[in-house]
């Protein structure tokens, strides 16, 4: 395959070129308390899980702390533990509901590493299936 064509991500790509971004979505959306509208599917003590509005694959989740931090070192041990437990919870739920063959799980630390929102750390949990021909940078 020469090119990945994911037209549902075009809105995200065009927004990413706009240097003026409003408030961090990982701060604003949980405060709004409208979880269904904001695609938040689970809340923990220190972290929450939401569907990615611009997914790489069906079921693409993001697990983020409520704290606005850019690096793992900035999280307290309890927050870091809750973050990893949130990732485990996400894979468990996706496994029961969507039955993927595997997952891509990762963090893009910094804009150079591909972070679209470099100021707020978050894990991507992307379910994968044999032959899905998808890609996660």
What are these regions (language model features)?
Residues 1-137:
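HIT superfamily nucleotide-processing domains
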């Amino acid at each position: 395959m020469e090119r990945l064509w994911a037209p549902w991500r075009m809105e995200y790509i065009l927004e990413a070129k706009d240097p003026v971004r409003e408030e961090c979505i990982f701060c604003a959306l949980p405060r709004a308390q409208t979880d269904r509208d904001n695609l938040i599917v689970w809340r923990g003590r220190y972290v929450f899980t939401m569907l990615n509005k611009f997914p790489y694959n069906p079921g693409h989740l993001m697990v983020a702390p409520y704290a606005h931090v850019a690096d793992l070192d900035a999280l307290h041990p309890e927050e870091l533990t809750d973050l990893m437990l949130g990732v485990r919870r996400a894979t468990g739920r996706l496994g029961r509901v969507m039955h993927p063959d595997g997952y891509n799980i990762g963090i893009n630390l910094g804009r150079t590493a591909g972070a679209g929102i470099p100021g707020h750390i978050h894990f991507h949990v992307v379910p994968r299936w044999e032959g899905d021909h998808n890609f996660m940078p």
